[in-house]
């Protein structure tokens, strides 16, 4: 049964992620999506490396991934769900709200950030997602994010 379920789920390597999201280095924060279930959920991966530019100042002697970038990685994973299900047609996903953000422990270079996103609701082109970021199965951050999908150029 688990194999059947796994077969219905999609994935996205970095090239597919780059087709789904307009972000580019240094602000593309998702390396791949290991699981995407229609328009309801996804698991994104961010491999945290010391070579990322924010670590030069946050903090020089003890590099910690800024919480706002963890939330941005959550929003990008949610955006990939929206974009993938929109199909062709030139739409952009705008991050609208963040609620209930909690940061449980630092994320440091060498960590593999696993971002779990579940759609809570959708009304027209407005979406609400619950997001959890984990390292080695331990919850490091969580938030509820809102997004809006609009046609490009508006």
UniProtKB/Swiss-Prot annotation:
Pfam entry (one): FabA
UniProt keywords, alphabetically: Cytoplasm, Lipid A biosynthesis, Lipid biosynthesis, Lipid metabolism, Lyase
The protein's enzyme class: lyase
Matching InterPro entries: FabA_FabZ, FabZ, HotDog_dom_sf
Top-level taxonomy: Bacteria, Pseudomonadati, Pseudomonadota, Alphaproteobacteria, Hyphomicrobiales
Record protein name field: 3-hydroxyacyl-[acyl-carrier-protein] dehydratase FabZ
Entry GO terms, CC: cytoplasm; membrane
UniProt gene name: fabZ
EC number of the protein: 4.2.1.59
Family (UniProt): Belongs to the thioester dehydratase family. FabZ subfamily.
GO biological process, one term: fatty acid biosynthetic process
UniProt xrefs under Gene3D superfamilies: Hotdog Thioesterase
Catalytic machinery residues: 58
Main location: cytoplasm
